[in-house]
Design a protein with these regions (language model features):
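Hydrophobic pocket-lining residues within nucleotide cofactor-binding pockets
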Residues: 87-89
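A short, conserved alpha-helix in the catalytic core of glycosyltransferases
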Residues: 56-61, 66-85
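Acceptor/aglycone-binding surface of glycosyltransferases and processive sugar-polymer synthases
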Residues: 1-66, 91-110, 115-117, 121-123
Length: 126
């Protein structure tokens, strides 16, 4: 399939047949549902690393640490169309993930609130 992309877009990968543990799959599914409910960001799998966008749209977004989780909401706030494409998931070849539930949960909640406030400000100004 070929996407016909117009200006102002973000393409997000959506991992099919994830190669993660049951615990990771469940926690990711819950986090995605909460994020999607709060931000209405049109992205099914924000933890998937595949993100394709135009640099000029990206540079309009205010940078903050861990913003990669919220790129769909931030792009949508700037009137970009969000597309989801299915991608194959692969096991990590080298190294290991340093992320755990404990070191992501509270930071994720705080950032979710920050982005929610940003999107509400954007609605008032836009």
């Amino acid at each position: 399939n070929k996407l016909k992309l117009k200006n102002k877009f973000l393409v997000c990968g959506n991992r099919k047949e994830r190669q993660d543990s049951v615990h990771k799959k469940i926690s990711s599914r819950i986090a995605n549902k909460i994020r999607k409910f709060v931000l209405n960001d049109d992205c099914n799998d924000t933890a998937c690393a595949l993100k394709v966008f135009d640099r000029k749209d990206y540079t309009k977004i205010e940078y903050f640490k861990n913003m990669h989780r919220y790129l769909p909401a931030l792009f949508k706030m700037n009137n970009c169309k969000i597309y989801n494409v299915m991608v194959d998931d692969r096991m990590r070849t080298y190294g290991y993930s340093k992320y755990t539930f404990n070191n992501r949960f509270w930071i994720g909640i705080i950032d979710l609130v920050k982005v929610w406030i940003l999107t509400k400000k954007g609605e008032k100004n836009g």
